[in-house]
Amino acid sequence: MNRFTPAKPAGARNVDEITGSRRLRRMRKADWSRRLVQENRLSVDDLIWPIFVIDGKNTREPIAAMPGVFRLTLDLAVKEAERAAKLGIPAIATFPNVEMGLRDQTGSHILDPENVINRATRAIKDAVPEIGIITDAALDPFTSHGHDGILRDGIIV
């Protein structure tokens, strides 16, 4: 029996007045029913493996701001992509770390077909054709000022 009285303000009513003395939790009682009504499911199909790429050979360079994460040379990036595919991860996202000597005000090195990210994309796709590769065409790794855009008269355009 519900003892709800409209005269009471909402904040003054307790749970029993709203639902009765019984709280219906039957959908959460057993594992099978919780799984049936679950709204979100996270699986390996939802994962994207980030790979940070640098020039060179056989080098793992720690990223101080992300403990346990490394910048990898192309050869090691390919191995990580192979590892991701073996684990069933459908895609990787690659992020370049471009040497300062290759950066300029306009990020022109991004257009070089032989830049580190373009070479990494080709090498990974050749070695692991079934994996998706997500690349970012951001300018910040390629500009000397580090902004994700072209800087003109102190304004990013």
Regions found by a protein language model. Give the residues of each.
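Short, well-ordered coil/turn segments that N-cap beta-strands
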Residues: 44-47, 88-91, 128-131
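Glycine-rich, proline-tolerant flexible connector loops at the mouths of alpha/beta enzymes
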Residues: 60-74, 87-115, 142-143
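N-terminal amphipathic alpha-helix/helix-capping segment at the start of soluble metabolic enzymes
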Residues: 2-60, 64
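Alpha-helix-loop-beta-strand connector modules within alpha/beta enzyme cores
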Residues: 103-137
